[in-house]
């Protein structure tokens, strides 16, 4: 399957988890990718896998902090120049931290906002001119089931993801007549490095978390499952999908 042959794709969070899995999925389907991440070691692992797969010739890596405006302006500009245009932006980068809300510091709150919400905004703002130039640009943003359903100890994180959903709806409407599609994936119950280490409080009430198990009874899904959904949404197979979010949670929330 070569759904991304001739397509140029910029992916944040490409050094781990779902972002990394998406890099490899797009490369496997013929796309040309610039992967960015704040974690240089993670990007090296992405390159090692691409080299083993024989797709490294279509992959460019850049270390980038998406919460740094100047770095994003320079980084997106360089990525568009390297690719020769831009067809798809996947905003997979993000951080997950848990806390009792009454113990959440302003620094904690601001860090989550800076990376998850502001980072998504900055990347999208800088990528939009190139995405609009082709007339069929796609933005795939990352929300979470926590944006819609109660996830204890995740108030700050959930607020950022709810903001991303609203942001996605707004840009989907604003640029629809210019051919842009904007969609959200809302993963839940995914086995990734981020979800495995959320830093839950020491006195966490595990009974509150029990309801977050997948209904399918298959355990948590891997990052590759979400990457497959992203590939569908970003390709022509998702051509009639915009301004919405798709939950990927194994039926946890039905």
Name these PLM-found stretches.
Residues 124, 160:
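Active-site helix of classical SDR
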Residues 121, 219-248, 253:
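C-terminal substrate-recognition "lid" of short-chain dehydrogenase/reductases
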Residues 129, 173-177, 239:
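Alpha-helical segment proximal to the catalytic Tyr-Lys
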Residues 144:
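Residue(s) in the substrate-gating loop at a strand-loop-helix junction
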Residues 203-225:
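Catalytic Tyr-x(3-8)-Lys segment
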Residues 90, 176, 181, 241-243:
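Short, small/polar-rich loop/turn modules that mediate ligand/substrate recognition or access, typified
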Residues 100-101, 105-113, 210-211:
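Substrate-binding pocket helix/loop in short-chain dehydrogenase/reductase
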């Amino acid at each position: 399957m070569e759904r991304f042959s001739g397509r140029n794709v910029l992916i944040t969070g490409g050094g781990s988890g779902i972002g990394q899995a998406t890099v490899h999925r797009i490369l496997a389907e013929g796309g040309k990718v610039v992967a960015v991440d704040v974690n240089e070691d993670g990007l090296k692992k992405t390159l090692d896998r691409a080299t083993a797969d024989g797709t490294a010739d279509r992959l460019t890596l850049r270390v980038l902090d998406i919460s740094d405006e100047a770095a994003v302006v320079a980084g997106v500009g360089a990525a568009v120049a390297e690719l020769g245009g831009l067809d798809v932006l996947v905003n997979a980068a993000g951080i997950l931290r848990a806390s009792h809300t009454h113990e959440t510091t302003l620094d904690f709150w601001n860090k989550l906002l800076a990376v998850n919400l502001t980072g998504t905004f900055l990347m999208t703002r800088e990528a939009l001119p190139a995405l609009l130039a082709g007339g069929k640009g796609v933005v795939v943003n990352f929300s979470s089931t926590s944006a819609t359903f109660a996830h204890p100890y995740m108030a700050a994180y959930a607020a950022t993801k709810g903001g991303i959903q609203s942001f996605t709806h707004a840009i989907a409407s604003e640029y629809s007549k210019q051919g842009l599609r904007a969609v959200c994936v809302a993963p839940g119950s995914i086995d990734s490095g981020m979800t495995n280490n959320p830093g839950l409080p020491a006195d966490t009430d595990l009974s509150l978390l029990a309801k977050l198990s997948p209904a399918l009874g298959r355990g948590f899904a891997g990052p590759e499952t979400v990457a497959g959904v992203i590939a569908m949404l970003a390709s022509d197979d998702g051509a009639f999908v915009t301004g919405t979010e798709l939950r990927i949670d194994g039926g946890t929330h039905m």
